């Protein structure tokens, strides 16, 4: 935000002159009038002079901070301290802080993260501890000419404020203390003012035991080196050189993505989304997963290729000795060694190096301290839960206390001479291994908003005894009464947030009326309200194994919006007239009032359909829906829609202890496909309607066509099994997958479809009008246009689509901002992110509960080889949805060799393991490391000499795994 002053109480006018230099080096002079005021508050609560200036005094010095070096005081902080240590100011130990206008503008210009934190602290999170003082508009503190020749302009303005406030507060016995970062600055200012301190010096003199945590946060900066150490990484190019390189095409901008198999390798997806460059070793140059980086292509003779080798920090740390783990000598570590193997030209890929960071993706990371054998050591390595993030070096004197806890650490900076980024301890989450702590880590790591709904959100809810009223309308069109229709819902067992229900009835010789009825969430969630803002922030409901984190409060999600059986509910209905061949004759949309005749599970609905004795209206409607769904499915697959596969399991939970009793692979029923087909049809129909009405701002969902190169793992795997995969079109891909059937290996087709899923791009929400129309298509569904309409209880995208459709048919007014393309794009950015994070959180929850389930158990299972690497195999266990690495120690003596090109493992020349073939494994939990128990696979059949333990790759998070 920008700071402004009131337009009254002007004391005088001064001329303020600034000089600036353009890119060609020419110097310009700019002069502007400054209206100086005498009514700007000093911020002191006791100040009788300033109390009538209409501001809220914040500095309540009657409850002073106790500091051994100064008495009653307030703090004036310089910009460098705020920029370097902005996280420290979250602490309530630092209060009665004054941020001058000069410092505010300096931080804003130099450091966006620090500015955002400062803005949040001053005006939201800690406004009772901060006061912004407009020193450059105050008649007593503004100075155009220099009064102190030995001070910089910034130092002089800071000192001017301190001297004024010292005099102004004299009768209150309060002194301002100036906090600075730079030693030279402190010495210069002390020539003119008594109370100047380093930030660290001030904290050291606090009379509060909590100061140690603040000192730990500062310690990382003191250990960053004096510039004489060996430089490990290249220096970044300047901002100007990067911009010039991007303009000329010699430098590209892209997103840095670390390999899940080899932490020394990464890929940069260039901004055009059509190009990717490979980066390895020190050429990653301090980039962290998710950073936006500037990259430069290396000369072709320096190109290389992925090692096809499993390199996980967990693996390498597991085989190190305890002494190695505690070793502080970074030069002795081989993490930064470059790969030695020279690739043939035919095997290489476009290889680049990071030459600069355009935007950091740093955040606060959950994890744990690695053990150190150096007694009393201050420097420690922090192991993030997210495996794609490097170890972080922190300094703390609380290591013994924190060793059994999950903690949060932030990265501060990454010097060229440090193998690891340097950071600081932020806070503790809880005891390592406890269910509550590990779940909290999971949610924090995936940035899942999970705080209880605020009072302002709950105030938006209707009364719990609310009942529908057919005459209650939000727009000019009346709500249609559909309570006489035989409508039912079909959902998973235990579902309480029922979004959708269906009906089907024959209305002619070859005509059927089919309806999809969706919960009318937008009747309750109105634009611009606190509940709408919260739903927009959360973006989606998150489903974990042992809990659900709702997008909307329970009163709506599980009651008033949920289409429960035998209860009247508001709905948004999409009703088709179609033939028995599923040819649509007409479609209509209206807000409605329905009464579901039954809330069925998938299993119960299947049972009713299959039982010829069931002849009631619900059974007849379900059978009609099933017949039509099979026609719709055949048509979609005929057009090239893909049928993909993934590993899905469900847990039978003990809800008292929140522990898994049983793990089951999800079974697919025809009723799953039945419901899916009509949800897809409704989404497509609504997409067509809102795009027709709002071609520049309809919220749609597209699935980009994957790059041909991304299919390589699939194509190679199929080729080694004797099948050809066609990737030139969606239909070609679908048809070739259908042909990949091996009677000796019934799982082969499913495994290939799982590999296909991994080759796909991510489907995304977008605003119509922001990409060319041909790119609107949804590749996986083989349809030209698509959106999400059918789940507004758990997806905010559907809420927006409901509003667009309601406006299009006159069922509701067009709300402010609804038709704004820029606003739609902003919403899409957030819900794309939230959707992705919710998926990752769900998978991490499965893996965490698999570990809990196997604690104290050992089981032998069938697995399938999903990949062969130079030092191990990747094994998928369908029964538990578990995919892990078994590391093989090959040697000439054992006769074991791995052929990555042929995707096989050989013993004495004979192939014993091939990709996509079954193996027998033993599953258990390895608890040798008390801090980090993990699932372990051991190969039982075929027996291979030199077997090591596994390290789970199915989730990058490593939450307890």
UniProtKB/Swiss-Prot annotation:
Domain PINc: residue ranges: 73-188
Start and end residues of each stretch annotated as Disordered: 322-346
CSD2 domain ranges (all copies): 381-447
CDD domains in alphabetical order: PIN_Rrp44-like (cd09862)
rRNA processing found in the keyword field: yes
A family per Pfam: RNB
GO molecular function: 3'-5'-RNA exonuclease activity; endonuclease activity; RNA binding
Coiled-coil residues: none
Keyword RNA-binding appears in the UniProt entry: yes
Keyword tags: Exonuclease, Exosome, Hydrolase, Nuclease, Nucleus, RNA-binding, rRNA processing
Primary location group: nucleus
Outcome of mutating residue 363 to C: In ust56; results in increase of antisense ribosomal siRNAs production and depletion of crn-3 and exos-1 proteins from the nucleoli. Reduces the brood size when animals are grown at 20 degrees Celsius
Start-end of Acidic residues biased regions: 325-337
Protein role: Putative catalytic component of the RNA exosome complex which has 3'->5' exoribonuclease activity and participates in a multitude of cellular RNA processing and degradation events. Has both 3'-5' exonuclease and endonuclease activities. Involved in regulation of antisense ribosomal siRNA production.
Name of protein: Probable exosome complex exonuclease RRP44
Gene name of the record: dis-3
């Amino acid at each position: 935000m920008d700071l402004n002053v009131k337009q009254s109480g002007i004391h005088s006018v001064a001329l303020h002159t600034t000089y600036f230099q353009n890119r060609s080096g020419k110097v310009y002079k700019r002069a502007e009038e400054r209206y100086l005021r005498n009514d700007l508050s000093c911020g002191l609560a006791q100040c009788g002079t300033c109390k009538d200036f209409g501001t809220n005094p914040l500095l309540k010095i009657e409850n002073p901070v106790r500091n051994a070096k100064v008495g009653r005081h307030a703090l004036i902080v310089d910009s460098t301290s705020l920029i370097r240590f902005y996280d420290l100011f979250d602490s309530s130990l630092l209060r009665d802080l004054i941020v001058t206008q000069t410092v505010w503008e300096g931080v804003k210009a130099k450091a966006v993260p620090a500015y955002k934190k400062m803005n949040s602290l001053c005006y939201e999170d800690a406004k009772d501890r901060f006061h912004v003082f407009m020193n450059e508009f105050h008649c007593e503190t503004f100075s155009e000419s220099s009064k102190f020749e030995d001070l910089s302009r910034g130092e002089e303005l800071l000192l001017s404020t301190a001297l004024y406030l010292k005099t102004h507060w004299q009768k209150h016995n309060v002194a301002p203390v100036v906090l600075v970062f730079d030693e030279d600055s402190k010495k210069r200012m002390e020539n003119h003012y008594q109370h100047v301190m380093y930030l660290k010096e001030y904290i050291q003199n606090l009379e509060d035991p909590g100061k140690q945590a603040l000192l730990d946060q500062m310690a990382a900066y003191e250990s960053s080196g004096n510039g004489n150490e060996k430089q490990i990484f290249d220096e970044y190019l300047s901002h100007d050189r990067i911009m010039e390189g991007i303009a000329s095409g010699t430098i590209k901008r892209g997103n840095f993505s670390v390999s899940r198999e080899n932490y020394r390798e990464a890929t940069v997806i260039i901004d055009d989304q059509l190009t990717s460059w490979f980066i390895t070793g020190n050429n990653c140059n301090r980039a962290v997963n998710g950073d936006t980086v500037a990259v430069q292509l290396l000369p072709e003779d320096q190109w290389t290729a992925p090692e096809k080798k499993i390199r996980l920090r967990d693996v390498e740390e597991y085989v190190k000795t305890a002494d190695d783990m505690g070793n502080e000598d970074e030069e002795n570590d081989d993490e930064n060694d470059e790969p030695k193997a020279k690739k043939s030209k035919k095997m290489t890929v476009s290889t680049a190096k990071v030459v600069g960071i355009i935007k950091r993706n740093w955040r606060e990371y959950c994890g744990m301290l690695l053990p150190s054998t150096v007694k009393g050591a201050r420097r420690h390595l922090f192991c993030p839960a997210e495996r794609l993030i490097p170890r972080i070096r922190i300094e703390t004197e609380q290591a013994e206390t924190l060793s059994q806890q999950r903690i949060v650490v932030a990265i501060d900076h990454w010097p060229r001479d440090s193998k690891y980024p340097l950071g600081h301890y932020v806070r503790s989450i809880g005891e390592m291994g406890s269910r509550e702590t590990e779940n909290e880590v999971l949610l924090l790591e995936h940035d899942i908003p999970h705080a209880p709904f605020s009072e302002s959100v709950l105030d938006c809810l209707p009364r719990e005894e609310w009942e529908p009223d057919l005459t209650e309308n939000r727009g000019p069109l009346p709500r249609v009464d559909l309570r006489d229709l035989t409508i039912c819902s079909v959902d998973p067992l235990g579902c309480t947030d029922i979004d959708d229900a269906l009906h089907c009835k024959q209305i002619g010789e070859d005509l059927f009326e089919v309806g999809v009825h969706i919960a009318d969430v937008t009747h309750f969630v109105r634009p611009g309200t606190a509940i709408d803002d919260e739903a927009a922030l959360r973006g989606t409901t998150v489903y974990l194994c042992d809990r659900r984190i709702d997008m909307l409060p329970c009163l709506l999600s599980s009651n008033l919006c949920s289409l429960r059986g035998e209860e009247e509910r508001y709905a948004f209905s999409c009703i088709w007239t179609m033939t028995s061949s599923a040819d649509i004759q007409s479609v209509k949309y209206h807000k409605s009032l329905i009464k579901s005749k039954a809330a069925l599970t998938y299993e119960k609905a299947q049972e009713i359909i299959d039982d010829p004795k069931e002849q009631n209206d619900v059974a007849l409607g379900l059978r009609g829906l099933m017949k039509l769904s099979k026609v719709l499915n055949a048509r979609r697959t005929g057009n090239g829609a893909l049928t993909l596969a993934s590993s899905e399991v469900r847990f039978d939970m003990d809800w008292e202890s929140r522990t898994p009793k049983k793990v089951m692979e999800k079974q697919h029923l025809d009723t799953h496909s039945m419901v899916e087909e009509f949800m897809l049809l409704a989404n497509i129909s609504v997409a067509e309607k809102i795009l027709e009405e709002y071609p520049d701002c309809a919220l749609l969902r597209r699935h980009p066509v994957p790059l041909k190169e991304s299919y390589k793992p699939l194509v190679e795997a199929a080729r080694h099994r004797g099948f050809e995969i066609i990737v030139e079109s969606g239909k070609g891909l679908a048809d070739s997958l259908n042909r990949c059937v091996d009677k000796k290996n019934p799982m082969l087709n499913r495994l290939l479809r799982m590999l296909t899923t991994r080759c796909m791009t991510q489907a995304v929400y977008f605003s119509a009008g922001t990409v060319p129309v041909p790119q609107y298509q949804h590749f996986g569904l083989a349809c030209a246009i698509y959106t999400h309409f059918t789940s507004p209880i758990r997806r905010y995208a559907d809420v927006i689509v409901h509003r667009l459709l309601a406006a299009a048919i006159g069922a509701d007014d067009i709300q402010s901002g609804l038709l704004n393309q820029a606003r739609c794009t902003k919403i899409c950015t957030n819900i794309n992110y939230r959707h992705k994070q919710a998926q990752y959180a769900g998978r991490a929850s499965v893996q965490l509960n698999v570990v809990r389930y196997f604690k104290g158990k050992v089981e032998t299972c069938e697995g399938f080889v999903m990949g062969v690497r130079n030092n191990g195999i990747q094994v998928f266990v369908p029964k538990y949805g578990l995919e892990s690495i078994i590391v093989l120690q090959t040697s000439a003596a054992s006769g074991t060799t791995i052929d990555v090109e042929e995707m096989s493992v050989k013993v004495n020349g004979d192939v014993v393991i091939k990709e996509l073939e079954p193996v027998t494994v033993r599953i258990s939990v390895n608890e040798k490391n008390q801090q980090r128990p993990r699932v372990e696979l051991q190969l039982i059949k075929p027996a291979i000499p030199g077997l090591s333990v596994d390290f789970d790759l199915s989730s990058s998070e490593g939450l307890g795994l």
